[in-house]
Amino acid sequence: MPDVDPTPDLDLEAIDSEPAAAEAAEQLRAALRHHNYRYYVLDAPVVSDAEYDRLFQQLQTLEAEYPVLQTPDSPTHQVGGPVRDELGTVTHPAPMLSLKAVYEEDEVRNFAETCREELGRETVTYIAEPKFDGLAVELIYEDGRLVQGATRGDGETGEEITANVKTIKGVPLRLRDDARPVPDRLVVRGEAYMRKDEFNAFNRRREEEGKKVFANPRNAAAGSLRQLDSNITARRPLRIYFYEIAPVDGRDFATHAEVLEALPEWGLRVCEDHIRRCDGIDAALAHHAALVDRRDDLPYEIDGLVIKVNDFDGHETLGVRDRDPRWAAAYKFPPRRATTSIEDLFVQVGRTGRITPVAVLAPVEVGGVEVTRASLHNQNEIDRKDIRIGDTVLIERAGDVIPQVVKVIEDERDGTEAPYHIPDACPVCGSEVVLSDDKKQAFCTGGMTCPAQFRERLKHYASREATDIEGLGDKRAEQLIDAGLIQTISDLYELEKADLLQLERYADKSAQNLIDEIEASLEQDLDRFLYALGIPLVGSATARLLAQHFDTLDALVDADEDALTTIDDIGPEVAHSIATFFADDANRGVIDEMRDAGLTLTNPYAEDAARLEGLTFVFTGSLEGWTRSAVQRFVEQHGANATSSVSGNTDYVVAGPGAGSKRDDADDRGIPVLDEDAFHALLREQGIDA
């Protein structure tokens, strides 16, 4: 069964100190990065949009109350999620921003009041349009011809999908110019999606062919556009609705309404049936209510209404704050709900040993999808809601992910219902399960020897953010485990090509490539290796802090909890988790076996760590020989901060080709802007080789 990844259940009002806030912030960052990865990279989210937004807002609140907790890689400074390398990456001519999600009418009215006051208008005109539940894409036309397609990616860079986009029948390869002249360069954005009926037919065909079906149209659309073989994309029933022109070469229009009129004249489809021009927010709210009533009858999935200030002068006045344009809001729909019964409860064991209770439900249809499972998060949640086996419950499914139990319908009880408690022993390895005092966290103590943990740990260990063994994806990791070839991480380094050639889908070249990649992974930066180990509560930021404080792995292994808590941003709970991990003989044994295999760790923070100390950099555009994450990591290794937005604390903006609004923002603030040559010159002045 798939792992159900829990999310932190935090009471922010109970946090009254910086150490406690630091622990909470690290938990939230780790959870958000994980969910970004599942949403943007795997196309397999395990939390609803509402739950993600709740976590995001909690982290925003903590960082606002404790500014010292803000980190350059915090999800609050990101527009979106990470980009895979397989398709290649491109830099967007202008950032593809995300929209602030709101769920209550009061929030919408507050948004509208802000617009009205800051624009100095009695009535603000909005454009209200459906928020499609698909994959955001960008197309670039030059001289009327399609030259590039890309996914949104992290908002600054995206995956290059030109060949795939060209297979979508509704996408013009050449724009019409009979009704309106076509600009020399046009950058348009839209949402790729599948109609419900076409998605259902597509899934039926896959089922008949013995292939895995997609959970929902959004995942199907995203997976189809990310194919390496465009012939596969061509066979998928994809469509695109366009909604925006990026302001990269100045604006030829005064309002968003004018853009929506121009797009179809060029052959770019917009959702004309459900777009409304609204004079005042009441009209937009009425349109939202109408779409809520009609959403199940629409031929495609939408999950809310996007409300935008119509005129672009208003956009300029309101501007962008962090990751959100202040001139727009996404008013999300309420989650779909249904009543069913709990047939059984069981627990799943995640990568870090976290135990998650899951309810087995009597099958019920929610929003057109049959639901048979619901996450219960933790024992505290079970006790608080008094959930028992046999109960009739109200469930909700928001964002097409694993549903949640909203409440028990106690009037339906007949006395046969049975209470449930997380077991004292791990159901997979038999090790002791430790339950926290507040019952919000339970962990299997089996560590690296627990098969359930190991299955997920191996995937994490090989991931791009960890040791980056590119050829060891999830399916291949599962294959190695199921074949009995590896039981611990160190077994990876005992594999031989002959072992792989016995397995399906391996030829001589692919087997040798994987062996070479595994061998290369023995040379690692200390912080990446610490992150790869999957220590509970240790994300990439905490791993970096540890590498900055301890020169070697041995020094960290020998550190006690008191020594660990002297590090800024590492509280007692995180320190206990680290010390417990390295005190475990099985964990230390695995690390020793990896050393015997040739593990070599380099600590990039041990030398020249302060050469750029005190400086804050912002990178924009494309840099030759650097990915965005690589150059940010490089300056951080030399003591600098790397942030995603320009502020009064920014010392330098490094701008390459395709630099967008960040360069303009720097010019407006009088912040030095460096091209790549000037950036390298600065590094040389500090005695740093790049």
Curated annotation (Swiss-Prot):
What catalytic activity is recorded?
NAD(+) + (deoxyribonucleotide)n-3'-hydroxyl + 5'-phospho-(deoxyribonucleotide)m = (deoxyribonucleotide)n+m + AMP + beta-nicotinamide D-nucleotide
Q: What class of enzyme is it?
A: ligase
- Please provide the record's keywords in A-Z order: DNA damage, DNA repair, DNA replication, Ligase, Magnesium, Manganese, Metal-binding, NAD, Zinc
Q: Which residues form the active site?
A: 131 (n6-amp-lysine intermediate)
- GO CC annotations on file: cytosol
SUPFAM superfamilies, from UniProt? BRCT domain (SSF52113), DNA ligase/mRNA capping enzyme, catalytic domain (SSF56091), Nucleic acid-binding proteins (SSF50249), RuvA domain 2-like (SSF47781)
Q: Which Gene3D superfamilies match?
A: 5' to 3' exonuclease, C-terminal subdomain, 6.20.10.30, BRCT domain, DNA ligase/mRNA capping enzyme, Helix hairpin bin, Nucleic acid-binding proteins
Report residues binding NAD(+).
49-53, 98-99, 129, 152, 191, 308, 332
What are the required cofactors?
Answer: Mg(2+); Mn(2+)
A single Gene Ontology molecular function, please?
DNA binding
The EC number(s) this enzyme carries: 6.5.1.2
Source species, domain of life: Bacteria
Q: Which residues form the BRCT domain?
A: 607-690
The task this protein performs is described as: DNA ligase that catalyzes the formation of phosphodiester linkages between 5'-phosphoryl and 3'-hydroxyl groups in double-stranded DNA using NAD as a coenzyme and as the energy source for the reaction. It is essential for DNA replication and repair of damaged DNA.
* HAMAP family cross-referenced by the UniProt entry: DNA_ligase_A
NCBIfam families xref list: dnlj, PRK07956.1
The record's comment on protein family reads:
Belongs to the NAD-dependent DNA ligase family. LigA subfamily.
How is this protein named in the record?
DNA ligase
What is the species listed in this Swiss-Prot or TrEMBL entry?
Answer: Salinibacter ruber (strain DSM 13855 / M31)
Gene (name only): ligA
